[in-house]
């Protein structure tokens, strides 16, 4: 909502809806005027996708109503973000010839971009964003700024982010059901990246891993360009499921995890025990701090494995000069950055949007759990300054491509695909980026770049794969019962 100089952004997560109202200060910082976090009840959102529109709409309404009452305003418009395992990233090349002589002009760059926007998207999908990579002049010279260079042919490979039409429509329906018009739709992963990164990190090479409840979003930057976006259909909820296996009531699991949990078993106190209420006073449950940490560590390592796989698919995993930035609700667990660093050998830090917040908002809005919502505000202000609008049905290819032609570089659609991919890797039959037509070159070299510094895994990979498959099957059963 744009009224009185402020904007409203709504982040729809698997577990919570985060609504924020913010404005931009004269020095370019975001000032948060109000915020509200509302829990998504039941299975309203599953791995980032709306499954029950009534439950999600009610959560939106709860968050928005609370802000309206405190601020004395009426919210009728908002910017929002999207995630989910339906999101996929593909690469598409295109070129144009110089319009005048042998010099590349701004109009040639504009024509190149417009050409990518004026063709139909594959059936059942919409384009969320089109991101040009480096430009190539006459098939030889590569440059980030082609205007003013000499040449006859301007080419680029575009990183195209696609989303499922049904999932996008459901998100917009959930907003409209509570009388909120969607002003713009952004990819959560990119919004989070904009919120937590510095310009130097984007230039040197960095990966942002946003650990949510149902999904983990991964975005890779290099030379200040978004090189890859991937969605892992696994988040902090897998930790909750294992904690429940100790007999802990579901309503106590999240608070137990966030208040007492640690991401490294060795850091937990060996003689500490936590007691939680049971169904009756006599049925209280007890769990040791080390067992709780062991559960968290095991599941976090699973998430890290798949996040690293997405980073490797970018072809830039050995060029991350600034390491990895962890954010999202799952990044608030103690020692998660140390676990990541010790396991992968990559530098890692946990961050919220502090570097982009006004000083008055640091204490109230600096949490990693608010990163995406603040990033949505930043993207909205950026596009408004450029007089841009979000086109949610941008086209894809100059020669309309089929889904089959595009799917080889897409994000895996569900955990069964991840299971099979991991199994192939362990059997030595799966290649890396280069093995499936990627741009990465030697697969074995790529695999060892990150894993050379890994510590030995704490558990057998086959047991993990079986648990992962069981997790997917249980989720499918629960979805069918709702």
Protein language model features and the residues they cover:
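Residue-level signature of catalytic and energy-coupling elements of molecular machines
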Residues: 9-10, 19, 80, 175, ...
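A short acidic Gly-Thr/Ser loop motif
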Residues: 10-16, 82-83, 200, 208-215, ...
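Short glycine-rich phosphate-binding loop at a beta-alpha junction
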Residues: 74-84, 314-329
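Glycine-rich phosphate-binding loops at beta-strand->alpha-helix junctions
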Residues: 163, 262-264, 319-343
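Adenine-nucleotide phosphate-binding core of ATP-dependent small-molecule kinases
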Residues: 177-184, 275-317
């Amino acid at each position: 909502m744009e009224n009185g100089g402020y904007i409203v952004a709504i982040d729809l997560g698997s577990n919570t809806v985060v609504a924020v109202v913010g404005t931009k200060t004269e020095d370019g910082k975001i000032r948060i005027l109000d915020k509200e976090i509302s829990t998504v009840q039941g299975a309203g959102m599953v791995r980032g996708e709306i499954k029950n529109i009534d439950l999600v709409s009610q959560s939106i309404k709860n968050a928005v109503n609370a802000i309206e009452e405190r601020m004395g305003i009426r919210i009728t418009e908002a910017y929002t973000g999207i995630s989910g395992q339906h999101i996929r990233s593909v690469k598409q090349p295109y070129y144009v010839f110089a319009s005048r002589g042998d010099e590349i002009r701004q109009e040639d760059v504009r024509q190149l971009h417009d050409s990518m926007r004026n063709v139909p998207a594959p059936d059942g999908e919409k384009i969320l964003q089109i991101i040009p990579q480096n430009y190539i002049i006459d098939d030889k010279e590569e440059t980030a700024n082609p205007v003013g260079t000499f040449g006859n042919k301007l080419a680029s490979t575009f990183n195209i982010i696609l989303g499922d039409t049904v999932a996008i429509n459901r998100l917009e329906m959930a907003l409209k059901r509570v009388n909120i018009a969607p002003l713009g739709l952004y990819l959560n992963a990119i919004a989070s990246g904009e919120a937590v990164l510095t310009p130097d990190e984007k230039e040197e090479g960095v990966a942002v891993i946003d650990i949510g409840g149902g999904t983990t979003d991964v975005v890779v930057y290099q030379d200040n360009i978004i090189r890859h976006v991937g969605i892992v259909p696994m988040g902090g909820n897998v930790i909750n499921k294992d904690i429940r296996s100790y007999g802990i009531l579901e309503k106590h699991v999240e608070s137990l995890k966030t208040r007492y949990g640690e991401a490294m078993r060795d850091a937990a106190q060996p003689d500490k025990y936590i007691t939680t209420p049971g169904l009756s006073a006599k049925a209280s449950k007890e769990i040791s701090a080390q067992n709780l940490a062991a559960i968290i560590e095991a599941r976090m390592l699973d998430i890290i494995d798949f996040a690293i796989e997405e980073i490797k698919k970018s072809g830039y995993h050995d060029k991350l000069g600034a390491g990895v930035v962890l954010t999202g609700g799952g990044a608030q667990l103690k020692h998660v950055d140390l676990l990541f660093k010790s396991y992968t050998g990559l530098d890692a830090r946990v961050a919220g949007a502090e570097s982009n917040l006004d000083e008055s908002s640091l204490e109230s809005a600096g949490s990693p759990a608010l990163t995406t919502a603040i990033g949505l505000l930043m993207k909205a202000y950026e596009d408004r300054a450029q007089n841009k609008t979000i086109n949610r049905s941008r086209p894809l290819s100059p020669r309309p491509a089929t889904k089959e032609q595009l799917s080889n570089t897409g994000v895996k659609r569900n955990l069964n695909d991840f299971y099979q991919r991991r199994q192939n890797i362990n059997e030595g039959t799966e290649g890396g980026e280069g093995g499936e037509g990627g741009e990465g070159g030697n697969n074995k070299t790529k695999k060892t770049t990150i894993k050379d510094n890994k510590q030995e895994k704490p558990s057998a990979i086959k047991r993990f794969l079986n648990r992962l498959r069981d997790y997917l099957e249980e989720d499918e059963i629960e979805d069918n019962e709702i």
